[in-house]
Amino acid sequence: LKMHGGGAPVKAGQPLPLEYVQENTELLTKGVCNLQKHIENARKFGVKVIVAINKFHTDTEAEICIVRKAALDAGADDACLSNHWAEGGEGARLLATAVVKACENQKADDFKLLYEDALSIKEKIAKISLEIYGADGVVFSDLAERQIDQYSKSGFGSLPICMAKTQYSFSCDASAKGVPKGFKITVREVRSCAGAGFLYPICGEIMTIPGLPTRPGFFDVDLDEAGNVVGLF
């Protein structure tokens, strides 16, 4: 959240900048808008929202209060400090209690989807881009246009959408922190997982991870003569 408020980039293998290990309420106050947007998005589905504040030993009481207030102001049903790393299960008791309460008070009829499957592929992508990411629109490459047309003609137009984009920003630009405005989602191609039953647009500069290596580990899993599973590790 401090990074979303303008904090320095975090680089793998390097110590965290001081603002992340020392109290900095100014950066945090600026960055909680990102959390509030996530809460707003979750509430679109009609579900209870519980925010887990994962406590680090460097977090201060003032910072924890800022996060909790921002979450509640945005409509979260609760925002609970969780200190399970230091205290084990007991440290997560408050969070667990809040989750149980939310489940008990949740009505199944309240749940709703963001879009109807019957919408066109482009309409579903636009719905996600505008309502979840806050984009002004969507730009489709020529390749994406051709792929969408082919999927629609092949009977895959009603499949749900799983967006593949950077996790560091609501936009396709990983450096655009907070809740960016005035941007468009760029779809450079659209791939299909017909067996699993969804389409996934590739947005901006993002690489996908293969689901299995060239030689998957299941080749080594077997049963020995006593019926024990071997080869898992």
Residue ranges and their predicted role:
Residues 1-233:
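P-loop NTP-binding site
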